């Protein structure tokens, strides 16, 4: 059964984008014309719908808690643990609206998907190139400075260890929040690896829990507090896994 779900996943994944290709082109024309409101409306309508479809097709049940912890008076930086390829559609479906993501450069090479991600405000990072990584962080910082919230996975890659753990949270991504004085909103994702990777990269039904935790203010942080921030956020997330 899992093989059929996996096939259905990829058929839906790209089928939706092909069927809605005219919407993509409309959004790109609006962006080129400087009509950011039309872009925002189209992205807000279609990205969550696409993401929820990915979950529905593969029998994923999503439980979300803590949406009231998302700041309403300005942008924030969501910091989530990274366990699965599913993490991106889980957050795009589960948060109050879709946000840009600091994503690996490989996603920027996938036809159609890369164009939607650019409209969403995603930034692609080349992890093995220091200068390119700095440019990506600067681009993400500019997005938050413009008033839009942003999502980062500070581990830099999927954590493949035991359930309930995370990799090291790298400090670089936290500079986005510190430079913009935006609050950090920790997000704990549990159960995601069991949807795909734990079963030999085959789509498997299951329940995932996304917990949005209280924001951590970065404005006025001392150097010592900034240095401790990555591990403090990691420990906050670990306590919820």
Describe the function of each predicted region.
Residues 3-4, 134-241:
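Non-catalytic C-terminal accessory region of glycerolipid acyltransferases
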Residues 3-11, 39-43, 177:
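Structural motif marking the loop-to-transmembrane transition
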Residues 65, 102-104, 126-127, 154, ...:
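Thr-Gly-centered strand-to-loop micro-motif
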């Amino acid at each position: 059964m899992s093989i059929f779900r996996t096939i259905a996943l990829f058929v839906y994944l790209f089928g939706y984008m092909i069927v809605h290709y005219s919407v993509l082109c409309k959004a790109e024309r609006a962006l080129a014309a400087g009509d950011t409101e039309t872009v925002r409306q189209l992205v807000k309508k279609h990205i969550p719908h696409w993401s929820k479809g990915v979950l529905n097709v593969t029998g994923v049940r999503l439980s979300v808690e803590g949406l009231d912890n998302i700041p309403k008076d300005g942008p924030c930086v969501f910091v989530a643990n990274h366990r699965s390829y599913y993490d991106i559609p889980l957050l795009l479906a589960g948060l109050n609206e879709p946000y840009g993501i600091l994503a690996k450069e490989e996603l920027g090479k996938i036809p159609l998907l890369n164009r939607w991600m650019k409209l969403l405000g995603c930034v692609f990072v080349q992890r093995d190139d220091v200068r390119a990584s700095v440019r990506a962080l600067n681009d993400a910082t500019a997005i938050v400075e413009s008033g839009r919230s942003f999502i980062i996975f500070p581990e830099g890659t999927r954590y493949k260890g035991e359930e309930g753990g995370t990799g090291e949270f790298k400090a670089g991504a936290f500079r986005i929040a510190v430079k913009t004085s935006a609050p950090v909103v920790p997000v704990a994702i549990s159960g995601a690896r069991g949807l795909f990777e734990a079963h030999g990269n085959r789509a498997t039904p299951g329940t995932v829990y996304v917990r949005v935790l209280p924001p951590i203010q970065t404005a006025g942080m001392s150097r010592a507090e900034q240095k401790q921030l990555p591990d403090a956020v990691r420990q906050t997330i670990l306590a919820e896994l």
